[in-house]
Amino acid sequence: MKFKKFGKALLLSALSAGIVLSVASCVQSYSVGYLYVTGTVTAQPAGNGIISGFQIDHNTGSLAPIDLLPVSSGGANPVRAVLLTGSRFLYVLNRGVNASGSADCTTANPCQNSNITVFAVGGNGVLTPQETFFTQGINPFRMIADSSGNFLYVLDHDAPSSAACALALGAGTTACGDITAFTVNQTTGRLQLIVNAQVTAANGSALTYFPVPANPVDFAEAAGNFITLSGGTPATSYPYTGGTSVFPYTFSPINGQLTINQNSSQPLGITQGTAIVYAAGVLYVLDNEPVAINFNGTQTPAQSQILPFSVGANGALAAETGGNVPDDPTLANPIYLLVESKGKFIYVVNQGNNVAGANAASGIAGYFITLTPAYQLSFIPGEPFGSGSAPQCLVEDPTDQYVYSADFNDSSVTGRLVDPNAGSLNNLRSTSTYALQGPATWCVVDGRTS
């Protein structure tokens, strides 16, 4: 059968249209996940904080607000959030406020009405509040999950009983912090308290938390251990700083129990530790050294640094061969660290001076990771990279193309495009900065979009 000229033209036109549509479909924008940001806006009922949410575009990294968000965080001053059970549930830690209504809670004037609020994550990213749970200690401020997602842990700055401190950590211990542990129900998202099987209270009853040395600053799961960064000098108000040593618990992946495996902390030779992060088999301690004290009592500005460690038996730390790594000298107050998904680059978020209008020295330091002949970190050309003022966190999107920081001082989210070869963080092809309704405190990424 032979086609007439008109028929041939019509067929070629249809084929061309099909090719065009096929090409267009290859570049069609779609969401690769959701970004959630907690914030301290108190316009919600009872002075609660909020959770904002954005869809992440796979082509540009641009963000679009999720319908029906922000929502109330379920309590005042949310500071941490964790996604679990296949990203079907979001857990938000609300610090609460003290008796005077201030967020500047201290050991003497502790936070009240602290809680963990659980949200169900809908297929379109919408959050629906479920239940509320409570820690066993006072002034909770950090929350993490184990690598399996079966257990959730909260670090309380102050344990409720000094007597239990001595029973767990040795005679003469008069004060301590604690870790409250929960089992996560993978079906309902509910939390069930884990009772301490190693230590009982002074009256012989079961202890409902795991004591850690006084003045905790941060904690992390690392190679089968839970390791707490604590300070020798009391840091009584949030955000807690001044970490000087680490203390390990052995972690059971079967029942979530934490077992003390040594009765003393390991000194790190620092005085201003701000955070501890375990990533890609290395434990990093971030150290903010604002001044060094000279032998004659004068002070010299000192550079912040990153301390990389391998984790050995019983949680003992051994410095990596390359030793301590300097932070970018133009930045200050490192508070979080991200190893990108391929293990080639490290990015350190520097909060700077967390005071609006101050010379913040905020930004992101970037490093190459060299594993051979020895573990080394070297600066990426062009760093430091921009962020908003006083970034609180840094996350990588599910496609490993973009990173986002959530910023306290200018109430924004800042997005950057990751160069997969050079490691540089570049402006997004669209808008790089997105406004929030108030100061940001933490961020998490959800890769589940249906």
Each PLM stretch: what is its role?
Residues 2-13:
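Bacterial N-terminal signal peptides that target proteins for export
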Residues 12-22:
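Bacterial N-terminal signal peptides
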Residues 25-450:
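Predominantly soluble domains enriched in secretory-pathway, periplasmic, or organellar proteins
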